[in-house]
Amino acid sequence: MINRSVLKIPALVKPLVQALVLVGCTLGVAQAEVGNPRVNQLGYIPNGDRIAVYKASNNSAQTWQLTHNGSLIASGQTIPKGSDASSGDNIHHIDLSSVTATGSGFTLTVGGDSSYPFSISSTTFNAAFYDALKYFYHNRSGIAIETPYTGGGRGSYASHSRWSRPAGHLNQGANKGDMNVPCWSGTCNYSLNVTKGWYDAGDHGKYVVNGGISVWTLLNLYERAQHITGNLAAVADGSMNIPESGNGVADILDEARWQMEFMLAMQVPQGQAKAGMAHHKIHDVGWTGLPLAPHEDPQQRALVPPSTAATLNLAATAAQAARIWKDIDAGFAALCLTAAERAWNAAQANPNDIYSGNYDNGGGGYGDRFVADEFYWAAAELYITTGDSRYLPTINNYTLERTDFGWPDTELLGVMSLAVVPATHTNSLRIAARNHIQTIASTHLTTQSASGYPAPLSSLEYYWGSNSVIANKLVLMGLAYDFSGNQNFALGVSKGINYLFGSNVLSTSFITGLGTNTVAQPHHRFWAGALNSNYPWAPPGALSGGPNAGLEDSLSASRLSGCTSRPATCWLDSIDAWSTNEITINWNAPLAWVLGFYNDFAATQGGSSSSSSSSSSSVPVSSSSSSSIIPSSSSSSIQPSSSSSSMPSSSSSSSSVVASSSSSVSGGLRCNWYGTLYPLCVTTQSGWGWENSQSCISASTCSAQPAPYGIVGAASSSSQAANRSPTLQLSANATGFEGGSMVCCTLHINGAASDPDGDNLTYSWQVISGNTVVASGSSSSASIHVSNQRGYEVSMTVSDGRGGVATETTFVSVYFSDYFPGSSSSASNINSSSSSSSSSSSSAIVSSSSSVVSSSSSSAASGGNCQYVVTNQWNNGFTAVIRVRNNGSSAINGWSVNWSYSDGSRITNSWNANVTGNNPYAASALGWNANIQPGQTAEFGFQGTKGAGSAQVPAVTGSVCQ
């Protein structure tokens, strides 16, 4: 996304219509301005925010008029709002929420000033959604962009040969394409075929870090449609006009796969040093100039060394892809999951491979020195997809701090996936994630309400890519609406879209081709019509980076000097203003996501427009600034972290996001918050709080809302008291069993529930293996036979018949060797009544449990509850992990293990344990992983040099292993 080239041809001037915006035109003695009032230049939806912004010279209300195709249909008075800090403008608001007319050809006037024309329709943004998605096909690498596919999806704009081009970097030109790209000189001795993927931005580089968040966003758009709205038709096969249309797979998945296959190809092959890591990026070894089509690139290209950040981007997105393609293309899904797990193990072994910045000649850096958030994101995606509890410690021990996201800040990507994707083993994490998103989105509404123009940005947030910061915040608001039904979140999205499409200080639509006065000269090597008529201008739908007070390029710095006191004005529409006017995949991805959400919201027509100048349109938020999503290791309820003895209050500086089915904090009284019922807080005096494991609203804040909202119910009348949900405690464990043809184990399920209102309760439970329900029932307890070695998810729901429910989920690991360890080992967790068996059957089980487990990617030897696994090996090195599993019925508090090598192997570095010694070796728990609950596993790893031959698999000993 970063290009530092010198342009040799002056940029063309803006069209005349923009000149009119800047200098105005004289009508009589008064100077009229076109583009003031500032409106969304595409238009509005009937149930969205419809406030226009008028730049005025004073604070006196003025008369506005709305015409429709020349006929006056409404008028009113502007609402003075005062000076806007980010723009320096004195502004008024114009509220059009009472207008019921729809169609095109609307214009607002104040005195002699007039807006650009706009529409009001529920379909206003349908085409814009497909325009934004089309950006990705146009920027594909390794394929010819053909004329029939250059037009937008579902006819959003017409195809044209001017946007077609030969395949880029595909076995042609001086660099011979991306089919056999070597490593940067002196960094490795192999080459990779990395022909696919998307060109990142104005340059022709392809970056795993920035590509990761981009492909994740498109896949999350799909998962939202799959799991929340059910509206997959919008991105279905045939919707986007791409070469794969008609293959039976959703077009958005075909487009995302083009990038995903590139990212898979960037993984270091097996047998090489740092196998499983991902190369940070691939690009030219020197900067090229503009204009330049991809197939004209004269520069050699090279792979930049692997980084931990890139590797975790691969782990996260490949895990996400694995679950999406599982029922579409099982082979591709398996390939993705294998790559994701390899990447995770490699990142664990190389946690400090931070991009050095020594390879930035020819491409952007994307250096990220803090990768704990990437570890969290990858762990969340892998846990959602696999249910493997080894990823839980990373999730449990990470403190959420950020309120927005971007390529270097990815923790919220993990939170959003946990919130969107349903899985039995993530039930409580999902509840907590949804609450966390609503809390963050509320802070953005507060910021937005303080801005004169409808951007959810403070004056300090107008930096490189500020428009993408807005788009990302709108994603969070959109999900908050999905989870709560609170109209304020949807209206926040609406306001942000209004800003991007023209309701801003510059009266400019920042999306190419969409509006009357739009960005025309984005920084892009191929869409360089501003420099050379042999190259095309940009097609509709590309999002400009937007105002940037940093002014990193020389043209912006010289033309915009003095703008920094009014940072929202620091933008220049010139192809060589790369710090303010570049375009890139990670900016267009959230634009597409937000427009998809907005079209869903527009289609509902369920809520009336709540446009208002009142400050009550923002959702109150607690003052807590950081939080953790922490699942209990012994049950599915999310509990406070062990470092805190009480639930966090709204005034704390750090808090744990928790979820519970506990009863209301305030008895029968509730707050009707714009159609959604919330409990009233007991101790929180103002705004929103967090009490008794759930969100609540203070009485003062709730009572200030207009009718019919506000406080409802009556605590003094039991007949009117709101229903309180039951509580549930679930436990599950496995015991050994042999009899007849059934060998192994019995899974015992026990639920204990109570209801504060004394309601009769009904139970339902199910046992899930992978994605298959292997047993279900409607009792409070059960015992079932299981015959496979694997992890089982046990879920139980209790209902009071009046809408109150409680759900608990727990995880039980079943391994035959745990229940039939052989005569030389002590058998634990086996009931005496089921311990007798025939010698032949027992012998078969002992033989099975004592064998060395092996696969193409790892080998392992069991030692009771301890397992040594080689995760990778190359010429003279290896990585391995030791897993300590608790198969008992009580927690393990502290553990240590020992092992030694007989072939000369040596350990060079380790993670997740205190490893000491020099053969033999000892490892002990760290504070955070010392406690292992029943059925759970602690895992640590290390890297070392091999002795002779293959990496040795030694026995692991220690009291915890027996």
UniProtKB/Swiss-Prot annotation:
Q: Where is the signal peptide?
A: 1-32
Look up the domain of life of the source: Bacteria
Span-the-membrane segments of this chain are none
Enzyme Commission numbers on file: 3.2.1.4
Active site: residue positions: D203, H523, D573, E582
Q: Which SMART domains match?
A: CBD_II, CBM_10
Query: Which UniProt keywords are given for this protein, alphabetically ordered?
Result: Carbohydrate metabolism, Cellulose degradation, Disulfide bond, Glycosidase, Hydrolase, Polysaccharide degradation, Signal
Using the chain's own numbering, where are the disulfide bonds?
A: C671-C702, C681-C696, C866-C961
Where is the stretch described as Disordered? 608-651
Write down the chemical reaction(s) this protein catalyses: Endohydrolysis of (1->4)-beta-D-glucosidic linkages in cellulose, lichenin and cereal beta-D-glucans
Matching PROSITE patterns: CBM10 (PS51763), CBM2 (PS51173), CBM2_A (PS00561), GH9_1 (PS60032), GH9_2 (PS00592), GH9_3 (PS00698)
- Pfam families of this UniProt entry? CBM_10, CBM_2, CelD_N, Glyco_hydro_9, PKD
- Name the Gene Ontology biological process terms: cellulose catabolic process
Q: Which family does it belong to?
A: Belongs to the glycosyl hydrolase 9 (cellulase E) family.
Name recorded for this polypeptide: Endoglucanase A
Gene designation per UniProt: celA
